[in-house]
């Protein structure tokens, strides 16, 4: 077991993990399971720093997969309203297992590669319910998180193997690859007795080029770690300047 692993439960009344195939037509429909990128966003909302990246290991689906259609009046680009039907997942709950790895593309933040510090800060953030608001795919689908356990009983515990075909996995941003391009990744997920084990982003079987991107320039501001003596230089106990 990885020492920096976090296991959380996330749940909400509705979820909208929009299928890219339905996004263009205006009537969104949710994928049946959350994508890697969605879960990474949920965990990052709990706690994130640019010095490390979250890696999603697996997710357990606790409740039956059910959908519900809603009539929505989205705002038109030129004003006024339109009528559309969105298909949501209803009464969703998941157990997410994830760990963090230090961002080797940010050597300027090497002083912040403190595993114990980030692990315990993330653990406290999880116990308090995250640092930022949690959403299940869309702003209108608020959710809540708490410490979880993969052994919690779920609806699909004895349902065997379920396949979901070719599905969206994640995005690869320009600052995450040497070419500086934006890519979309796809894979074939399978659920074994309610648990989906994710492949790493670089292991996805299908990668599609989207567009040429621009890498963000990194600053040369020196970063000090929390264990550096000079970090508190000039201060005395109580936080006051000497």
Segments the model singles out, each with a brief description of its role:
Residues 10-14, 63, 96-104:
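Beta-strand elements of well-folded, non-transmembrane domains
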Residues 74-76, 81-242:
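Internal, well-folded beta-alpha domain core
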Residues 5, 56, 91-95:
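Extracellular structured ligand-interaction cores
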Residues 1-26, 196, 215-216:
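N-terminal, Lys/Arg- and Ser/Thr-rich interaction peptides
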Residues 29-71:
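Glycine/small-residue-rich interface belts in oligomeric ring/scaffold proteins
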Residues 16-18, 67, 104-106:
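Residue-level signal for secondary-structure boundary sites
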Residues 22-40, 120, 124-129:
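Short, flexible N-terminal segments of the mature chain
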Residues 19, 54-56, 107-109:
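Short, hydrophobic/aromatic beta-strand segments
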